[in-house]
Amino acid sequence: MPRIKTRRSKPAPDGFEKIKPTLTDFEIQLRDAQKDKSSKLAAKSNEQLWEIMQLHHQRSRYIYTLYYKRKAISKDLYDWLIKEKYADKLLIAKWRKTGYEKLCCLRCIQKNETNNGSTCICRVPRAQLEEEARKKGTQVSFHQCVHCGCRGCASTD
């Protein structure tokens, strides 16, 4: 969520009015996702967070695309958006590195989040999962990531 505006906050730089409606839509969607009633089942409680994480990802990707791909916003506006927490600075930094262009969330690359000390299964390319399943004679058992609900964010997918 963006920071709360106070008297000490700097005003938005030029160009913010052009992207404000889209950012407002994201904010409304995030509020709606937070208002949803949570389930008492452990599996269902994670799914509520998935929607919030996906909206957070989409908003950060929108700002990333505007600045790095389309070059539609100024550096001042980009820095202000990062400072006001409209986008995730660390996630955008990972997207700029090779191999992480489609990264869904930072939890999926943290090695201490898993039992065996490796990254999340959603980071494994789908072709590799299918090949290993074919060798074993089984179906691919991976459908969604437990952390964020991602269906696969390897850069080769």
Swiss-Prot record:
Involved in pre-mRNA splicing. Important for bud site selection. Signal peptide: none annotated. This is Pre-mRNA-splicing factor BUD31. One of its GO terms (cellular component) is U2 snRNP. Belongs to the CWC complex (or CEF1-associated complex), a spliceosome sub-complex reminiscent of a late-stage spliceosome composed of the U2, U5 and U6 snRNAs and at least BUD13, BUD31, BRR2, CDC40, CEF1, CLF1, CUS1, CWC2, CWC15, CWC21, CWC22, CWC23, CWC24, CWC25, CWC27, ECM2, HSH155, IST3, ISY1, LEA1, MSL1, NTC20, PRP8, PRP9, PRP11, PRP19, PRP21, PRP22, PRP45, PRP46, SLU7, SMB1, SMD1, SMD2, SMD3, SMX2, SMX3, SNT309, SNU114, SPP2, SYF1, SYF2, RSE1 and YJU2. Belongs to the BUD31 (G10) family. It comes from the Eukaryota. GO terms for biological process: cellular bud site selection; mRNA splicing, via spliceosome. PANTHER family: PROTEIN BUD31 HOMOLOG (PTHR19411:SF0), PROTEIN BUD31-RELATED (PTHR19411). Keywords: mRNA processing, mRNA splicing, Nucleus. Present with 1900 molecules/cell in log phase SD medium. It comes from Saccharomyces cerevisiae (strain ATCC 204508 / S288c). The keyword Nucleus applies. Its main location: nucleus. It is found in: Nucleus. A motif (Nuclear localization signal) lies at residues 2-11.
